[in-house]
A protein has these predicted regions:
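Long, contiguous N-terminal structural blocks used for assembly/anchoring
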Residues: 1-81
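Amphipathic protein-protein interaction modules
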Residues: 61-137
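Non-transmembrane, interaction-prone alpha-helical and coil segments associated with secretion
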Residues: 141-142
């Protein structure tokens, strides 16, 4: 395998993991709010969920497109982070003031300050609505 093919394969795997962990973070944070409107499942309730569990084919394609575009636009900075962390940070940054500030790109010290700001701002480009699990499938508005 030549270097270019290996690089493409590596980033393809990164995108898949990024998408899975971003979805897990979204479900952990957003789904099944309690009676006070506080969102979130226990992590154990959502850690098994994958992108394949997104019920609607178009929504699944759009989710992957969003993740792919974000990763491809920010490879230089994301190369400093494992896909798991980057996916989780992406979702919280994406939520902006409705996310958990301590779990966003803005505060991750593994990144230079300029990269933290750039990734945090870039995360808000794609609108995603409410996320929930029903009948073992993921549903959300894209």
């Amino acid at each position: 395998m030549d270097e270019q093919s290996q690089d493409a394969s590596t980033w393809s795997a990164y995108i898949d993991e990024f998408a899975r962990w971003a979805l897990g973070e979204a479900l952990w944070w957003e789904s099944n709010p309690d009676e006070n409107g506080v969102g979130g499942d226990e992590w154990e309730a959502v850690e098994h969920v994958t992108v394949a569990d997104i019920a609607d084919d178009r929504a699944r394609e759009r989710w992957m497109q969003m993740c792919r575009e974000f990763v491809e636009m920010n490879k230089e900075h994301l190369a400093l982070l494992p896909a798991e962390s980057a996916g989780q940070l992406f979702w919280q940054s994406k939520r902006g003031r409705w996310g958990v500030p301590g779990r966003s790109f803005r505060v991750d010290k593994r990144l230079p300050k300029r990269a933290r700001r750039a990734l945090h701002r870039a995360s808000s480009r794609w609108p995603v609505g409410y996320v929930f699990i029903r009948d073992e499938k993921v549903h959300f508005e894209l």
